[in-house]
Each structure stands twice: as C-alpha cells, then as structure tokens.
C-alpha cells in the first residue's frame, strides 16, 4: 500500500510498502470504533469500515511483521454514544481475548509480538495486557511492545511503571522491548470534561512520543 510520509522541513513523499518474505515478529492489531451498524454491539460481518481502517492503520506494519487483525463485536458508534452495560462492553473484549488465545495456541510459535490498538482497540488491549500479558512472564517475554494510542493508559505521577500495569513499563528508549507506547493528541488544551488525556491527583495519562525515543 502506498503512503504519504511527512519529511523534515515540511516536505512529503510517497513510500510503497514492501512485505518481507519471512518477517521476524508478529503484530496483533485491534481496530478502533468504526462500526455504524444499528445496535450496541457490532456483528462479525466485515463491512467496508473495518477493511478501510485496518488497511490505513495496520498495513504499514506489514513491512516488519505478520499482521493479525481479528474481527470483534465492538461497541458501535451508537453504542459508544449511549450507555452500554458491562455485559455489552465485555462482549467486545471477549472476542479479542478469544482471538488472542487462538493466536498464541496456533500461530505465535514463540515469536515476538507487537500489540497495536487505537481508541476502542487500545482500551480493549489495555484490558488484555492487564489481565493476560502483565500477569504471565511467558507472555511478557514475547511482548516486543504495545502501541496503545488514545487509550488513557494510566501510570503513577512521575513513574514509568505501575498504574494500569504492574510489570509492563512505559517505553523510554528506542531499543527497549516489552514496554508500552501510549498517548492522546489534541489540537488545543483538552477541557476538564474530556474523555481522553485527563488523569487524577495520583495518576497521569501516559504520554510517550515515539518520535522522540532514542536508541
């Protein structure tokens, strides 16, 4: 897939993604809220919305890894704007959890894996890391990194570990593995009632700029 890349100095250029024959790692991608289906939870029919967002967000990673992008019964745009029950929220997570277990059992084969999620995908993967990866040394060993964008990952103020995850730290170096990149972007200062980027007195929302990480 062709992509426009913004270069230093304000110029831009086209890059064509090339897929390696034998990528050394995997990527497990969970797409954001895109379903416009009626109802609170989407069904598992692949609509154009899922295809387009997966191509736009995940295809670039195919230059480095095998991409696994499971369908799941996400909360739809209607569901997000309403008041979904805990059971409806759990239904979205249940599908991703089942896909993760299937991936580990049949496809991982002890390979390193990058977790990638945006918006609702990041929230779902936050829970997956918290309940699965963070608790299991074998799974933490496979984690290359977790890119959880717009997911309100919490850490204690001034700390890089703790909060949402007890063992998986924030990434602070480009060469670091087993860590998490998280941030939410705003074009202005977020209001006090913003859904993203607002911490508490003791916890802050993780903000790692991957472009600033140095090896």
PLM regions and their residue ranges:
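Structural recognition of the beta-strand scaffold that forms the well-ordered cores
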Residues: 26-30, 68-71, 114-115, 145-148, ...
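Short, well-ordered, mixed-charge alpha-helical segments that flank or form enzyme active sites
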Residues: 76-79, 123, 153-157
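Active-site catalytic motif of lipid deacylating hydrolases and related acyltransferases
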Residues: 20, 29-112
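Surface cap/lid and interfacial helix-loop subdomains adjacent to catalytic sites
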Residues: 95-109, 130-215
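Basic, amphipathic N-terminal segments that precede the first structured/catalytic domain
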Residues: 1-15
